Amino acid sequence: MRGKLTLQQRLILPIVLLGLVALLSNILAVFSINNVHANAGTIVDEYMVSEGKLEEIRRSMMDIHRLALSHIVAEDHATMIRLVQEIKAEEAGLDEKLAGYESFAAGTDLETYQSLLRDYEAFKHALVYLVCASADSKTQDAYAMANGDVALWSEAAEADIDALYASVSRQAEAARGRLSIVYITSLVISAVTLVIGVLL
């Protein structure tokens, strides 16, 4: 009886061990999948969205600048009024985009974001002087303003956007590196548990 019990135990032991390995393998697989998913989600939800928002901000700045330059060469007051309305609408949209981007700015990026807001405000003030000179038929003054303060603050805001974009790209690259490490770790863990399962 005693020998028979030992034989049963010997037969059951590999099955129990295989069950434990399978359970451990499944737990580790779920953990690894969650890690990969979390890292991939961060890349998509945070960094790629942030880059997209920065491109929208850049495009809006360029559109406002283009509309202001169009105001200088406008031939009649109706066109000038329409362009001013378009500038105001674009500025309102850009104000919203900039406010929406605040949640993406953290750490050192927050300082660059604040600089972008200051440069954008200065850009808007310079546009007011440009449009006033243009509306008053002071074309030379308007061109001087376009090549002076408007260009200066537009370039400063563009530099801020470039700095934010570069920072986000670096963070996304670091997250991709972490994702690769998590993925490779997951593969190694799966391979080890598979080998252990086969050996049992």
Predicted regions and their residues:
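Amphipathic alpha-helical segments and their boundaries
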Residues: 11-64, 77-84, 103-120, 154, ...
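Amphipathic alpha-helical packing segments from all-alpha helical-bundle domains
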Residues: 85-100, 156
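Short, Lys/Arg-rich, polar N-terminal cytosolic tail immediately upstream
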Residues: 1-4
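Cytosolic-side ends of inner-membrane transmembrane helices, especially those
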Residues: 14, 189, 193-200
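Juxtamembrane amphipathic/coiled-coil helical coupling segments that flank
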Residues: 30-47, 65-69, 98, 108, ...
